Structure formats: structure tokens, C-alpha cells
Amino acid sequence: MLVSATEMLKKAKAGHYAVGQFNINNLEWAKAILSTAQECKSPVIRGVSEGAGKYMCGYDTVVGMVKGMIKGLNITVPVAIHLDHGSFDACYKCMEAGFTSVMFDGSHYAIEENVEKTTQLVKDAHAKGISIEAEVGSIGGEEDGVVGMGECADPKECKAIADLGVDFLAAGIGNIHGKYPANWKGLSFETLDAVQQLTGELPLVLHGGTGIPAEMIKKAISLGVAKINVNTECQLAFAAATREYVEAGKDLQGKGFDPRKLLAPGAEAIKKTVKEKMELFGSIDKA
């Protein structure tokens, strides 16, 4: 069932587990992630970046596809469609298209402008029953052209944004989009703890979930993280499985070139990755 992310994340924080946000890029990804969530009886958040939305022919197409799959696959677990790292304008476009959750990435604005824009979005999103995520402190790496240096957020700025009524908050704690470099210093749990102390029961979000050691993930959850974003790891798994299929010459055997067969190993690899993450996050049987 299609819902906002608010209640599932409140429940996750109270239950000391996290819900995974798995980004979708096409039909195969959407189907693999939805079916795995149903199998695992886990709530799930479908992340859609602005670039992925454009690739899939617009936000209306994304919503139509996900709604159709929920009906066609008889999906009964809670599902949110969430704009990932959205601009101010994109948030409104997604709300109009039927997204149930949006993230406003105002981390590149001065705190005063971030507060102003977030205040307006909170008012308009909540009027439609849509959940809203905000970000303080840019996440490292690149996400569809949005580049961050992996800085740590100012806990006081996090409180200022939290007090605006956002439903969950992404705070930079040294995390990075994409692959983590060998010299990565790890997550700043000191920052995360300080943010949680100031924001109370507000669910916190960890971006860049690919490659973070399991023990760090578990500690982050213990310090209030209730939503963890995963994208790169699914992409790598999909690419590796597809490469193996082609290099083994299976696309040349019979009708192995049929895209339904060609893309099947990649889809199975995504399902395996998603299930592993749901187990790690503790969300299995929490739907």
C-alpha cells in the first residue's frame, strides 16, 4: 500500500530498526525492490532522484508505474515514493504527481534561506499528507550533479531545521554517496549523538549506505537513524550480474538476448542486495 514515510519511520525509531530507501532507475529495479519488500514483510521507501525521474519520462510515469506494480503484484507492505535530494521546484512537481514523500536538499543554501524554503515546503507538504525530509550538512560525493564534501552538520542548525516540523532529518556525519575511499575516516558518531540529543524523537536519516561497515550501521541505528539510503550497492550488483551473463555468452544462446532474460540476473542481484540490507537494518517482519 502506498503511504507517506512518516509513520513507518516513527515506528522504526521507536523499535530501534531502520527502513531502507532503495533508489529505482527503471521497471526492473522497481519490481525487484517491491517484490523483495513483500517477501520480507518489510516497509520500504522507493527513492527517485531528479535525474532518474527524468530518465523514466517524468514523475507522473514513476507514480503510475509504482501504483500499477503495487496492484499487479498484490503488494500489501507499506511503500513510500520519495524524491531524493530534490530542489525546491522538484519537490512541488513531485507532490503534484502523487509522490507520498519528498526530500528538500537545501544544504547548499545559507541556513537562513534553508529555513525559509523548508518552512514553506513543510506547510504545503503536510497539507497534502506528504512527508518531508530535510538535510543539514552536505553529504559527500555526488548525487545527480549535487556535489558534497562529506562535512559534519552543526547540531544547532539541525535543531533549527527540525523545529520547523520536518518529518525526518538527514544530517551530514562524514557519510559519502558512492564508493567510500580507502582513507575514509568513518562516521562521526559524536556528531550523530549530539544531533539526536537536540532533535529528540525525530527520525534521522543516513545517506550513502553503500559500503558502511555493519557495526557502524547498527551503532547509527542505536543513535536514532531510522532511514538508510542505498543506491550504489544495488547498481554495482546489477552491473556485475549483467556483465557475468554477457561474458558467459548467455545472450548468444537461444533467445538469451531477450531483454527479459538479459536483465533477469541483474534484477535477482538487486533482490539479494535489498534482502541483505533489510536483514542488517532489522526491518524484516516489521510491515
Question: Where in this protein do the model-derived segments appear?
Answer:
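Alpha/beta enzyme core
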Residues: 3-11, 15, 27-52, 59-76, ...
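Glycine- and acidic
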Residues: 14-17, 259
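Metal-dependent phosphohydrolase cores
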Residues: 21, 199, 213, 259
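Conserved phosphate/anionic-ligand binding catalytic regions in large, soluble enzymes, centered on
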Residues: 22-26
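Glycine-rich beta-strand-to-loop/alpha-helix junction loops that act as flexible
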Residues: 206-210
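Active-site gating loops and adjacent loop-to-helix segments of metal-dependent hydrolytic enzymes
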Residues: 245-258
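Short, flexible active-site recognition loops that position polar ligands and cofactors
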Residues: 255-271
